[in-house]
Amino acid sequence: MRAAHLVWAALVVASAASGASAAQVGVHDPVMAKQGARYYLFSTGPGITFYSSTDLTTWKPEGRVFKEGPAWATRAAPTFDGHIWAPDIYHHDGKYYLYYSVSGFGKNTSAIGVTVNTTLDPRSPAYKWEDQGPVVQSVPGRDLWNAIDAQVIDDAKGTPWMSFGSFWGGLKLVKLDAGRTRLAEPQEWHTIARRERPAFTPDDEAGPAQIEAPFIFPKNGWYYLFASWDLCCKGKDSTYKVVVGRAKTITGPYLDRNGVDMARGGGTLVIAGDSDWRGLGHNSAYTFDGKDYMVLHAYETADRFKQKLKVLEMGWDRDGWPVLDQKDLNRYQSALQP
């Protein structure tokens, strides 16, 4: 997320505003994992904030992943201030890999790092995050892509891939090595989604190609690529929305419902804002206990457009496209556990 830290204030939001729902969890860019009977939620914030829950509704604050920013972060992003963006949590072979982004606002002076733990339970004696450093870095003037908003997934053969990107030349997919902490060699890159970037846009500017936050979700022989279009983090003026395409292979092409390649500007709308909720986006998607869910943030009109967590059950139409019920935005309300 390019601008989350400009409006990110308190992760725990309580408001006395008329009609507002109090004591909900306020997050940007939420991702989840389940260990045992407990869910863990990670989000953009100082040091990466996280919560735990047993029911996906009531959440207990668990502090921060990083007490101090990664030691290498200011070398990659000299203006880094400890505010870590867009985490992704991934489990493999008994380890949890937490990918995250450091960046300079409005520039592609960015990098994606990863830290590893054997447990998500902060009360376990085995709990210890061990940072592995940067996985990939973008440099202004060299790269026409932005190394933020990572998601990692294994394909059907067990090969790990990282999708990422924001604005510039769109969303990328790159193969990871067997250790899941570095790019595989020889490197293999794909552009999986983009929007039109006008010619002669300076390379060091994000430009108006408003797309970011890829998330690939496998289902029934398809890979579904979710992405966020338009603008986050502008309160009532936020225009974020979630779009999707799908492919039979993880490298694409990802086609929307009309057969348009997302790498050529395609994308089928999944959910957008309404009068009660603005700026829906930066979603993740999971299957928990046989049900599919979309997890995202949204800004609540009745609470001065503060960011709130949304966990929405996701269905599928007869043609195999994801379906959400807009009314669930009001039905789902997280609760902060004291």
Pin down the residues of each PLM region.
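N-terminal signal peptide c-region/cleavage motif recognized by signal peptidases
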Residues: 14-18
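Bacterial N-terminal signal peptides that target proteins for export
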Residues: 1-7
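Carbohydrate-active catalytic/glycan-binding domains of CAZyme proteins
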Residues: 19-338
